[in-house]
């Protein structure tokens, strides 16, 4: 049995992984899905000062207080920023890292610095016009998301503090010692932001590379297929 811990994506929260809990349990695994400060059921704690380090600390404290060790840490989308920071600071608790259609930062990167210029301009326009100058409005869900999943997800996706995307990550290099896997979801949306990280992972030593015939949120759209893939990674 393996314990998986999720660093979720932007605007999301632990709720988004609801379909995955019984599937991972049926495969003999434990899935832990914390929610970052200021999002989801913790959205009442939102304020302009929340940054990337806040979210990294959220996950670090779950590992510490639950005394979780030998975990597989999953970073989905924005959660790749968080998972990288967590693994670098708590490498002794992590067995391996899985990036699920996620950002893979190097020291000094921020999510905004890794975002193409046209996307970055659109994000900042949304912050100014809809987010009171400090919150990022949610992107639309992928077009292949089922109607019932759109209805379930949309009211739960809340705006995210801008500093979580602005703050550069600080890394000491410990994360580079861990086994890492990249799962690229090949039904990409406009811009295909994650192709750059998938291409890097495919050729770098120390990485395993996988593709899913899925759009950006396979934990919602194809949860069984994702559960099988994660089980295979755990056993490999």
State what each model feature region is:
Residues 30, 36-71, 88-89, 113-116:
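Active-site loop/oxyanion-hole signature of alpha/beta-hydrolase fold enzymes
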Residues 155-174:
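Active-site nucleophile elbow and catalytic-triad environment of alpha/beta-hydrolase enzymes
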Residues 186-213, 217-220, 232-233:
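Conserved loop-alpha-helix segment in the C-terminal half of the alpha/beta-hydrolase fold
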Residues 2-43:
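Conserved HGGG/HGGXW glycine-rich cap/lid loop of the alpha/beta-hydrolase fold
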Residues 88, 93-94, 98-139, 193, ...:
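Flexible "cap/lid" loop of the alpha/beta hydrolase fold
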Residues 35, 72, 95-98:
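Residue in the alpha/beta-hydrolase core beta-strand immediately N-terminal to the catalytic nucleophile
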Residues 75, 79, 83:
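Gly/Ala-rich beta-loop-alpha elbow adjacent to hydrolase catalytic centers
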Residues 182-184:
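Short beta-strand/loop motif that positions the catalytic acidic residue
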């Amino acid at each position: 049995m393996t314990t998986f811990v999720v660093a979720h994506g932007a605007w999301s929260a632990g709720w988004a992984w609801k379909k995955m809990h019984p599937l991972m349990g049926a495969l003999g695994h434990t899935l832990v899905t914390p929610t970052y400060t200021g999002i989801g059921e913790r959205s009442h704690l939102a304020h302009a000062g929340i940054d990337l380090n806040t979210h990294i600390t959220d996950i670090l404290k779950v590992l510490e207080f639950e005394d979780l060790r030998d975990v597989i840490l999953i970073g989905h989308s924005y959660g790749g920023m968080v998972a990288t920071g967590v693994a670098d600071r708590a490498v002794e608790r992590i067995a391996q890292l899985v990036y699920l259609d996620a950002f893979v930062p190097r020291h000094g990167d921020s999510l905004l610095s890794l975002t193409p210029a046209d996307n970055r301009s659109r994000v900042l326009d949304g912050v100014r016009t809809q987010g009171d100058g400090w919150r990022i409005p949610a992107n639309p869900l992928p077009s292949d998301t089922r109607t019932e999943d759109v209805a379930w997800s949309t009211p739960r996706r809340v705006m995210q503090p801008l500093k979580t995307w602005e703050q550069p990550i600080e890394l000491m290099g410990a994360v580079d010692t861990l086994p890492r896997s990249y799962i690229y979801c090949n039904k990409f949306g406009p811009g295909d932001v994650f192709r750059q990280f998938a291409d890097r992972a495919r050729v770098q030593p120390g990485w395993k590379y996988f593709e899913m015939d899925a759009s950006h949120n396979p934990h919602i759209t194809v949860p069984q297929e994702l559960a099988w893939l994660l089980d295979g990674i755990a056993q490999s």
